[in-house]
């Protein structure tokens, strides 16, 4: 990127030249010198424009633009010459207003788009795949009721005809993921829906992702959905009790943002869970009893409403209530609940309005599984009362399943009176045969292929941000938002190349500065979309300056970038065992980038801090690491021996790289399965932990490793042995504190 000028479109321009009124047109010229070569040069004009401008580059008309506010215009600059070049503008006032304003910044772009091409052409859309149930919720194990875990084979696809005429489906078929041929005479009425289920087609819809194609009688591709089970795709459709619903028939069915998990929250019913147990630990256990608490937690990601929580000692006689806040009526909606600790994977839980309109409830939300002393919702018993192993305790609460896992575990610390309840879920899932509940009046523009360049900019070097944008209504505006060091958001217009690729330029910054950005696109019907989808809550980040990483003599280099506040929370010792995943950006070998990856600390509590810290990074399946892995581990404990038995080249607490060498030898010599480890130089998200050489662990003992090692090794349930670690004090000695 080569800046030719600067402007801040948020600030109304101060007139430098006051133009005389009443003119039919105004003319401007700007010359600049250029040396060097560019394979695909483009000129980007961004700023404020009121009127119509004709742009001439070296005497050739290259673009015309009409605007009443901020604008972005990307122009083919193949006429770029060594030496002097001339940009000329002809500004024509709008007929409806005598005002003319021109305050544009120009940047020269290299125009490279090979890393992220424009979106493919829109599919015909005469009939669309409108809803998919590819992984119905299973039957969950419930030993108390003698129910074993069982997968649910039910699968179905819904087609929708959004047109005004019926469509003859004779000879049409599904291909790739499943095989199904529509019979002769099959019709889909105008505005109608048609469902094909697993009893009709051959093959299955893969739970981890598949490509579903619909072809007409001439074998032309009518629609295509390359769905996945996670990442940018709605995770709740993967056995979480929801289906994939298209948000609008004209939305691009190939993109994850065009789909949403069906909303099942209105279908589930309240239920009351009540059971009794003594205060004794399970026979043969030696669990700690230092804390006196009631705990709730999901065994996987899930959501439920909770109300009327009660733990009663001697329920038939003394009836002593031990829960201090079981109704949540004194709490503030949108915040945490008084006397409760909502931690780790359950940290997004909050008080909500009762769906019946009266009172308040706890919206218990888990991003992943609960654990024995953290990553749960917990509350200290009234008066910090210790449990009596000979007394009876009655535990009761109301629950209403909302989404995800229905496996809700309740217990008294540590593992007394423990029970996992399978919350009741609605029998019907999704909206087969009818309009989607998540359908929008109009979907915003489709965005794909976001990338900033250079990935690791030097000080003062402008950064180009580009992505592909498309919309059937046409694009009205694309705006690039950016924040410097978590400061106030600023904006700059983006310009298109006429082929669906849009560009914006961010100003250069000093070494060490960190910039977060996202794009807002609005179509001509007024619908808006953000990319990454979370907008300001997403994490597309770059840091200025190399930080010495490129000079390291390690083949693989990885940079993990987080907002400072997020990184501080990630490494906060109080929350050291949290498994909540924070959004981040990952750059690998300064060539590949992942925005909105997810990271948490890993290892046992004592291995999550200092020079032993490790990171578990999760990538979306739409862009796996090295084309295969959806999660990796960076093990900061790194030991490298000299190799001659005389000591270490690098030494810290933890395993040596010799283990990697032994695995590699065994794998090559005897085809013995290995966990595919490597060495990486890792740039940590903050200086406190220090950049370092580290072990890059890829498969570990995940399903891909088990599949290579054993026949059907990834099938069934994987059990993990876990040692019991527990805190012995709080920050201030108060048992209700952290």
Model-derived segments and spans:
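Extended carbohydrate-recognition surfaces in non-catalytic/accessory domains of CAZymes
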Residues: 1-40, 73-74
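Extracellular and organelle-lumenal recognition/adhesion modules and their flexible linkers in secreted
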Residues: 263-442
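Extracellular acidic, Ser/Thr/Pro-rich low-complexity tracts
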Residues: 34-36, 49-51, 93, 161, ...
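Phosphate/dinucleotide-binding and metal-coordinating scaffold of catalytic cores
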Residues: 47, 439-440, 445, 512, ...
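Activation on beta-sandwich/Ig-like modules and their edge loops
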Residues: 54-78, 83, 109-266
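Glycan-association/targeting regions that enable binding to alpha-glucans and other polysaccharides
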Residues: 266, 425-588, 592
């Amino acid at each position: 990127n080569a800046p030719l000028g600067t402007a801040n479109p948020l600030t109304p321009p101060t007139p430098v030249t006051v133009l005389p009124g009443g003119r039919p047109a105004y003319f401007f010229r700007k010359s600049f010198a250029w040396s060097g070569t560019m394979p695909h040069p483009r000129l980007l004009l961004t700023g404020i424009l009121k009127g119509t401008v004709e742009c001439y580059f070296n005497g050739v008309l290259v673009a015309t633009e009409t605007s009443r506010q901020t604008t972005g215009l990307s122009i083919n600059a193949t006429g770029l010459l060594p030496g002097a070049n001339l940009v000329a503008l002809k500004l024509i006032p709008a007929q409806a207003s005598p005002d003319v304003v021109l305050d544009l910044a120009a940047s020269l772009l290299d125009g490279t788009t090979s890393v992220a091409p424009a979106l493919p052409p829109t599919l015909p859309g005469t009939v669309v795949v409108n809803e998919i149930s590819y992984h119905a919720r299973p039957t969950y194990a419930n030993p108390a009721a003698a129910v074993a875990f069982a997968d649910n084979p039910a699968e179905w696809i819904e087609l929708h005809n959004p047109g005004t005429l019926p469509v003859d489906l004779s000879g049409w078929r599904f291909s790739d993921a499943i095989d199904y041929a529509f019979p002769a005479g099959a019709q889909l009425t105008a505005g109608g829906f048609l469902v094909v289920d697993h009893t009709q087609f051959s093959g299955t819809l893969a739970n981890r992702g598949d490509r579903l194609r619909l072809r007409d009688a001439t074998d032309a591709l009518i629609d295509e959905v390359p769905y996945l089970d996670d990442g940018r795709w709605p995770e709740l459709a993967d056995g979480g009790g929801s289906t994939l619903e298209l948000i609008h028939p004209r939305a691009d069915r190939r993109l994850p943002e065009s789909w949403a998990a069906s909303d099942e929250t209105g279908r589930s019913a309240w239920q009351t869970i009540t059971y009794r147990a003594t205060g004794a630990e399970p026979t043969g256990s030696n669990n700690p009893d230092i804390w006196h608490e009631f705990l709730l937690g999901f065994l996987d990601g899930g959501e439920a409403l909770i109300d009327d929580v009660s733990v009663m000692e001697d329920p038939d006689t003394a009836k002593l209530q031990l829960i201090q806040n079981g109704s949540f009526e004194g709490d503030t909606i949108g915040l945490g609940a008084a006397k409760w600790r909502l931690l780790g994977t359950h940290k997004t839980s909050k008080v909500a309005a009762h769906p019946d309109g009266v009172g308040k409830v706890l919206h218990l939300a888990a991003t992943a599984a609960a654990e024995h002393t953290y990553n749960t919702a917990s509350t200290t018993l009234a008066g910090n009362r210790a449990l009596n192993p000979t007394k009876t305790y009655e535990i009761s609460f109301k629950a209403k399943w909302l989404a995800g896992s229905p496996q809700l575990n309740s217990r008294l610390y540590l593992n007394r009176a423990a029970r996992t309840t399978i919350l009741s879920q609605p029998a019907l899932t999704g909206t087969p045969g009818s309009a989607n509940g998540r359908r929008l009046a109009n979907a915003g523009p489709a965005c794909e292929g976001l990338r900033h360049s250079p990935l690791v900019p030097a000080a003062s070097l402008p950064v180009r941000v580009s992505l592909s944008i498309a919309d059937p209504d046409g694009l009205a505006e694309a705006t690039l938002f950016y924040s410097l060091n978590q400061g106030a958001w600023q904006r700059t217009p983006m310009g298109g190349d006429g082929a669906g690729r849009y560009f914006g330029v961010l100003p250069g910054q000093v070494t060490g500065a960190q910039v977060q950005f996202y794009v807002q696109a609005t179509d001509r019907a007024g619908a808006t979309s953000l990319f990454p989808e979370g907008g300001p809550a997403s994490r597309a980040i770059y840091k200025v300056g190399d930080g010495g990483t490129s000079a390291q003599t390690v083949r693989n280099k990885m940079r993990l970038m987080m907002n400072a506040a997020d990184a501080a929370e990630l490494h906060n010792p109080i929350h050291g065992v949290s498994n909540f995943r924070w959004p981040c950006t990952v750059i690998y070998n300064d060539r590949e980038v992942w925005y909105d990856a997810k990271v948490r600390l890993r290892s046992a509590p004592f291995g999550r801090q200092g020079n032993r810290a490790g990171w578990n990074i999760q990538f979306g399946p739409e862009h796996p690491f090295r084309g295969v892995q959806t999660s990796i581990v960076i093990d900061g404990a790194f030991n490298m021996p000299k190799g001659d038995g005389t000591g270490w080249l690098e030494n810290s607490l933890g395993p040596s790289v010799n283990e990697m060498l032994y695995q590699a030898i065994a794998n090559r010599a005897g085809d013995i399965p290995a966990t595919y480890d490597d060495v990486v130089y890792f740039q940590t998200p903050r200086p406190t932990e220090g950049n370092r050489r580290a072990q890059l662990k890829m498969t570990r003992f995940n399903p891909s490793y088990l599949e290579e090692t054993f026949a059907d090794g990834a099938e069934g349930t994987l059990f993990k042995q876990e040692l019991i670690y527990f805190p012995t004090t709080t920050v201030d000695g108060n048992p209700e504190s952290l």
